Amino acid sequence: MSKRKSISTHDKSTKRARPVEEEEDSEDADDRDQDVERLSPQVLPSGDVSDVGIVKSITLNNFMCHANLGPFAFGSNVNFIVGKNGSGKSAILTGLIVALGGNAQATNRGSSLKGFVKEGESFAVVSITLNNIGKDAYKPEVYGQAIVIDQKITREGIRTYKLKSQSGHIISTKKEDLVTILDYYNIQVNNPVTILTQEMSKYFLHSKGGAEKYKFFMKATQLEQMKDDFVHIKSTKSVTVDKVEQHSECLKDLKRDYLEKEDRYKSLASVNEMYTKLEELKKQMAWALVGEVEKEFEPMKEKLESDRCATNKFNEKVDEWKKKVEVAEGKQKQSHEQLEEITQQVSELQSKCTEFKTEVQRRNADLKSCEVTVHRHKAILRDLEKDKAQLSSKINDLSLSISQATGAESQARMERIAQIEAALEDLTHHTSTLGQQIEQYQHSYRHAIEGQGKMKRELEGLQKSIDANRRQLQSMESSRSNRLQRFGDQMPALLAAIDEAHKKGQFKHRPRGPLGYLISLKDPELALSIEICLKNLVQAFTCDNYDDERVLKSLMTKVLQHGRRPAIITSRFFPKVHDVSVRAVNHPDYPSVLQALEIEDPVVANCLIDQRAIECILLIKNRTEARRVMQGRNPPQNCTSAFSVEGDQIFTNRSYTADQTRANFLSKDVEEGIRHLKREMETQKVQAAHIQQQIRSTDKNISENQDLLRRTQTEQKTTEVKTMKLQLELTDLKNVEEPQSEDLAELKSAFENAEQEYKQHKQLIDTAAEEADVKKVETKLTPLFTSLSCNILWVHCLFVLLQEELSKTDQEVMKCKHHEKHYEERRNAHLCSIKTLENNVASKEKELQESIAKAKEICPEQLVVRRTARSLDVEITRLKVKIATQREHQGDREEIVREYHEALESYANKAQQIKNLNNFIKCLDRVMDQRLYAYTVLRRFLSARCKYYFDSMLAQRGFTGNMTFDHKNETLSISVQPGQGNKADLNDMRCLSGGERSFSTVCFVLSLWPITEAPFRCLDEFDVYMDMANRRNTQRQSGLKMATSQKIRQLIFLTPQSMSSLPECRRIHIVQLNDPVHGQTQMEQEEEGP
């Protein structure tokens, strides 16, 4: 490693003037002091000095003959790099040029970059730091306040760049980014005024002709580049004019060829019209098939919407009857509770009644005993007072009266009991008969209600079938002129809406449908079996994607507002039919469904293959033959099922009979279908009228049963009340005690002893009278017993009424539960039908989307087609035959059309190119005139500025001079007179001494600086060949004066001379290089020049 070069500013205390310079120093001392005085007041703060784009430092490693130079720091204004020959001054300048992107020729130091790598080393590195401070900084948020440019040069001459930020992070490695930074800072590496190398300085110094000076001026001001651009543009313009002339000749041949092709093309006008019509028919055919699928889809969708709306009604009905059941059960529970309470009251009252009855009978017996005793004693007393005859007669009369009274009362009571028992037996039998009648009436009522509901449901189904047949009849009648009407009255409107949406770009692929409209049968007899096989797919649409499906659903919602909407099948569209040769059934005698259909659209065929596997289903007209084929020992391979001409589906182990009797969509005989539908509708109307008559008869029977049931229940209640009254009366009669007859013997004995016991009886009468009064009071319980009996009767009646109410509530609960179950079953069946319908609608919608997508592939814009697909198919076939006949006579139409369009396009393109080139040439002439004028004005302006600055700099030295520009001959002559202008005439620079000529050259170069924009200037050995006097003047000129006048730019001067004559100043920075190492080779010394 070589010793690092020292960097220091010049200290005037250590400077020693050479002896030969003492005289010049003394003569110029006053001038130098004045310069210092002028400079000192004008020293500005560092913030006023431009810091953007100036060189902050440079470092060289293994560059040229130096192992390590630097880092060298530079000031922001005037910099002198001072050093002896071989110290590395020119290496610094060369490294600056190379690091900023200059090539080897720009350095005048070699022909290749690999020559700059030090001998024995594999690469060289040059690193330059540019200041990036100020409002004009380049991307300060990325690079910071400095931009570091590292360039690595390999031994092979390959160089790489690294642009780093202030912190050392690598920002870019592209030369384009370096060029962008240089353009941003306006750093012109190849401009000799920006960087004047030693060789260029020597060449300019020794040049004696005015052409070289003029060329230097042009290159320094970049006018030479502008001139070269003008020359290049003019030459390019001449080439362009020549090419335009050549193209014009070629254009004539192209026009001739185009006219020939046009004549042949016009002869195909009739064929073109047929082709146009054929394409239009194909488009109509595609959308006609879509319309048929839409007609099938819309009724399904409408039916689904209406069924969904009806679901709420079913829910409301179920909830309503649930609430009624709860209310009825509440009433039933309340009636049960009340009945239990009444039963308990009856039980309590009956027990009380029995107790009261027993007590009353006992007290009545006591009362009668007391009264008998009183009367007996009174009679005894009266009898005692009468004579015996009268007493005997009285006893006889009394005995006879008792005998007669007792027998009549008992006989009457027994007869009444027999009557009551007979009446009770009749009432019991009658009550049983009424109960059986009530049960019979209730059973008839329930049976009639169930039959009525069944007939109403049957009538509702018939009415729906009639409405569907009526819509289908309307569609079929409309389909006489338009087959699409079979799929629904609103199907043409739906297809029109699909066409309109497709024109607006709402569909990615036009949906296809109805699928049944897009297929045709090879054998019309198979229409019923194929239609039953395809089921809802006949009316379905198919779409390519779910976005198209949503658009199609919205269109169906708007257009198909009634009836069921077709299903939509969403499946990706393919331009070719699926290859089903491996899995398809192939029978020698019977076709598959796929083979029996004519399908032009591959999307429709693929949809039917994917959804129904029509390649695996056979069509066998004879039902018996179909069973033999399918249910034999060897059924056909890949065959899943077979259909007979009647629509029966036969599997290998079972078969199903079809309910449908005729084809509704695929049949060609529309009139027969219309007649069949009318007959079917008449039959359904007769059935509906018969069912309505039955419903009315059932309503009448229900009403009569209700009246009979009500009357019978009322009669039963009345009979029960009568039975209860008779039972109470019978109980009372059976409980009556017969009065006991008095013993006449005792009476006679008492009579005989009457006299003896007269006194005793007198006392006994008083005692018995008192006791009888007491018994009378006690017998007053009898009204209470009667009241209690009435209460029992009333409670019993209430019990009967509650039983009747309970029976009503039981019937009401049963009725509500029956209705709840009925509506629950209807709702479940309705939900199942909705789910099935949703699946069908989804399938049909998918089919519709696929149909629309397939139609959009043929015609992106939806068309309103009023013709049937069958008629369109016939016309397409006819046109194809006619076109084939025309092509045989005229040749290949496509080839003729292709050649015509190619000739037309070639001719039009060439004509447009020539027109554009002519317009460009005219515009170029106009712009060139404007630019040439601006170039002349700029050249005159820059020449004037250069003269001014040159005269000013010569005057500072006391020289006079003249600078003459001859722009016409491209020469520049400079005349300089060392003395005053009034003392001597101007001389050519060739007459000057070497020092004066070198000084004048420096003045010329410095005069170009103000008119050349760049953040820094660099001169290599600017004072070469100067004597000491001119060198000191040049130093002051370049140092002090430049520090004053060029304070916004960075100036770098390279010189081997001492800068001791310069005063110390903050704007002047001197970099002192170390002396070269002793023993350095001659080649190392020669790198610095003389």
Swiss-Prot record:
Residues 21-34 have a biased composition (Acidic residues). Residues 8-20 have a biased composition (Basic and acidic residues). GO terms for biological process: cellular senescence; double-strand break repair via homologous recombination; telomere maintenance via recombination. InterPro entries: P-loop_NTPase, RecF/RecN/SMC_N. It is found in: Nucleus; Chromosome; Chromosome, Telomere. One of its GO terms (molecular function) is damaged DNA binding. Its main location: nucleus. Pfam families: SMC_N. The keyword Flavoprotein does not apply. SUPFAM superfamilies: P-loop containing nucleoside triphosphate hydrolases. ATP binds at residues 83-90. GO terms for cellular component: chromosome, telomeric region; PML body; site of double-strand break; Smc5-Smc6 complex. Disulfide bonds: none annotated. The keyword DNA repair applies. Keywords: ATP-binding, Chromosome, Coiled coil, DNA damage, DNA recombination, DNA repair, Nucleotide-binding, Nucleus, Telomere. Residues 480-667 are annotated as: Flexible hinge. PANTHER family: SI:DKEY-119F1.1 (PTHR19306:SF7), STRUCTURAL MAINTENANCE OF CHROMOSOMES 5,6 SMC5, SMC6 (PTHR19306). Belongs to the SMC family. SMC6 subfamily. Forms a heterodimer with smc5. Component of the SMC5-SMC6 complex which consists at least of smc5, smc6, nsmce2, nsmce1 and nsmce4a. The flexible hinge domain, which separates the large intramolecular coiled coil regions, allows the heterotypic interaction with the corresponding domain of SMC5, forming a V-shaped heterodimer. This is Structural maintenance of chromosomes protein 6. The lineage of its organism: Eukaryota, Metazoa, Chordata, Craniata, Vertebrata.
